[in-house]
Amino acid sequence: MFHLINFQLPLIFSLLIVLVAAKILGEVAERFGQPSMIGEVVAGMILGPSLLNVIQNTAELKVLAELGVFLLIVMAGLEIEVEEIRNSIRGKNIWIALLGFIIPFIGGALTGYAFHFNNTFSIILGLCIAITALPVSIRILMDMGKLNTEVGQKIISAAIFNDIVSLLVLGVILDFNDESKRLSDIVYSSAFTIGKIVLFMFILIVAYRLFKLVKSKMRIVNPKVNDFLHYLRGKESLFALVIVFVLIFSSIAEAMGLHFIIGAFFGAILLPRTIFAKGDFKKVKESTSGITMGFLAPVFFATLGIAIDVTSLGNLPLLLMVLAVSFFTKIFGGYFGGRFAGLDRSTSFTIGLGLNARGIMELVIANIALQRGFIDVSVFSILVIMALLTTIFTPFFLQCGFNVIERNSPRPNIHSS
């Protein structure tokens, strides 16, 4: 077997092959109306031990993948504003957000227990199944021209809620004791972590209040901020300042024993948009997207594919059960949430179909669980395949749901005077 790792510059050659393969297959996926991450993960599977075995997950590639995780989470946070978080839990929308998360979470956890896995694994399985990928959902709905419809907005609101809750639950899971067998052990081992999360949320609330105070003084603050930004001569200085801002919150999270992505996500959300001059915030997002989607994200998704070992997928019953539970519990959660919110059956069912899009956040959490030793390669492989398959089929089923809504919607009477 030919191994590129034997070359004098293994990182450069490995990176070249990984990036080229990931971008080519990512482009192929885009041509078929799928997120590029699907092609990028498949590229890793082809290059890794599943097929060609020419690339290994070296320490250097893992460092680049970690940077990719950081910037992917920052990108997700930059797409969310505090007001959107309020909208996701405002009024009857809370039913869709809650049941769209809780029912799949319970279904996934019960699946883990049914297969005699420990508490930590079962809860991680439930968490990965419960997530709806915000960027993937936005992309699918935009391609369908349904982003600004009632169904589209409720799916996005639920996805925002899911992303936030999933990271908070992750913070608790990372301190679980694997040897715990009783519920009381889990509660006691998690109490300190929950306290840290509450403290971190308090810091976020204080920061948000300070930013609101600054916003109320915009006539005084804005000119000074703009003068400072114009004073900077270095290229992409504004982008660097944004990264520093987010890193501060990531560092706070790490110092408190939480994972850095929790701080990165909430730091990006709290970033005050109003202090930017017209067009500057868009430039920051474009800079972040360029380095992330053009370089680091493909490397991250490819490393996930490299980590998959298809030969380790010996537990076919678990794979089939995870696929079934992940698909149907999301439908049930969205359906019952929609019904409690006062929506009709077809609209509620379509929301449940739309909540099945998974991707970035679920893959990030699965990767963290693998690194921490909470799950093995076979389970990790099942979670990645589940994310890919549910995401691939979601656009087709969602379009069917929209077609049902259109057929059931009242048509104007063209003969009426």
Regions found by a protein language model. Name each.
Residues 3-17, 58-75, 119-134, 193-202, ...:
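Structural signature of hydrophobic alpha-helical transmembrane segments
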Residues 7-23, 81-114, 119, 182-203, ...:
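Entry/N-cap segments of selected transmembrane alpha helices
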Residues 19-32, 75-88, 137-146, 208-219, ...:
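C-terminal ends of transmembrane helices
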Residues 55, 59, 87-99, 117-129, ...:
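The feature identifies polytopic integral membrane transport proteins across all domains of life
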Residues 76-80, 103-108, 129-170, 329-337, ...:
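Short helical (or helix-break) motifs at transmembrane helix termini and adjacent helical loops
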